[in-house]
Amino acid sequence: MSTASTTHTQTDALQSDDLAAQCVDIARRAKAASRLLGTLDTNIKDQWLIESADALIEASDAIIAANQLDLENAPKYGLTDAGIDRLRLDEARIAGIATGLREIASLNDPIGEVLDGFARPGGMRIEKRRVPLGVVFFIYESRPNVTADAAGICVKSGNAVILRGGKEAAHSSRAIIEVLHEVGRRVGIPDDAVQLVGTTDRAAVGHFLKQSDNIDVTIPRGGENLIRRVAAEATMPVIKHYDGNCHVYVDESADIEMAVDIIENAKCQRMGVCNACESLLIHQSIAADALPAIAKRLASRGVEMRVDERASAYVPDGVPATDADFAAEFLGPQISIAVVDSLAAATDHINHYGSGHTDAIVTSNIAASEQFTALVDSSAVMVNASTRFNDGGMFGLGAEIGISTDKFHARGPCGLRELTSYKYIVRGNGHIRG
């Protein structure tokens, strides 16, 4: 059966009356495929990644044509400018996807790594060995590049993946999966290892979330409402973050030029992503000197500044901020700004309004940086660096499957190791317990 017919058959089946049974079937097939992937030789996984990267480049025209269909439908789905930006694919972005797959291939395979090993007094030997989680159910919205990223990182870490993309990127994701399946057949990775759910019916998500016998973890990546629904309904563990209300705090000892550059990058380099800066805090003793320069730079980039009463003295074009503004993930050309009395006031503000994603301090005082990193309760805390660096690629982890603000199992960028668990291998010589 051709890749296209496989995809379309799955789509038709999932749109039949027996949706629940079809979801169970997909999950069971993924579970079976995961047993193969867990023992697959690293060379085969890397071959699939490298050949898939090359094949995606070769298929650029077809993928861009499919993406154009999604872009034409974007107004019907009410996508914002930020959403359309996340949806758009061109040759450069496809090349970036291919580069990401090659980078994953270059990373060490975590599966089989011995984390610990020791011998008991009676001669019994015990190993703690890294193993895949099994099956990942990955839910995402209008980012077709994530289709390849998620497939790549799951296969390299020995996991099967069920991909449920948003309707906004349906054509793009299908075109990418067709390429990955064709390569998989050549190298020995079954279609069931990487399955794209062929319906946008929201009921399908609910059916998959009940499949704890076959699905080992769910990772939702999208809007807060989606993630809260998944967290409430899932019967298996969930790796997630709700939003990205990221802060930059300018300390009293900050280099002003550095602060201006970091804030511009954190806010403006790419506004529609979860690690973009949404809130600026500045120490009262440096506000008069630093805030006008920062405001001038942000204004030149078209950013609307929503300011508290104290900040308004230095930002005459600012809009009065509401309490909701300080908790907002704007994903666009807006930023909230507040003047604070101290570093402690800044960390209190961040821990109250923030989302535990990424927060930064600009300072020349080592003690201040240590205090900030100790007090801010986020997955990544930056010192004199943009919030935009909280990213699997920037951390050298390869393409990430998401960023977690949870504290159990995974926190921060979720790379290969975050998609693994471990088991104990015990070797005896006829040992019995007395």
Swiss-Prot record:
Keywords: Amino-acid biosynthesis, Cytoplasm, NADP, Oxidoreductase, Proline biosynthesis. InterPro entries: Ald_DH/histidinol_DH (IPR016161), Ald_DH_C (IPR016163), Ald_DH_N (IPR016162), Aldehyde_DH_dom (IPR015590), G-glutamylP_reductase_CS (IPR020593), Glu-5-SA_DH (IPR012134), GPR_dom (IPR000965). One of its GO terms (biological process) is L-proline biosynthetic process. It catalyses: L-glutamate 5-semialdehyde + phosphate + NADP(+) = L-glutamyl 5-phosphate + NADPH + H(+). It comes from the Bacteria. It is found in: Cytoplasm. One of its GO terms (cellular component) is cytoplasm. The keyword Acetylation does not apply. Its EC number is 1.2.1.41. Belongs to the gamma-glutamyl phosphate reductase family. This is Gamma-glutamyl phosphate reductase. It comes from Rhodopirellula baltica (strain DSM 10527 / NCIMB 13988 / SH1).
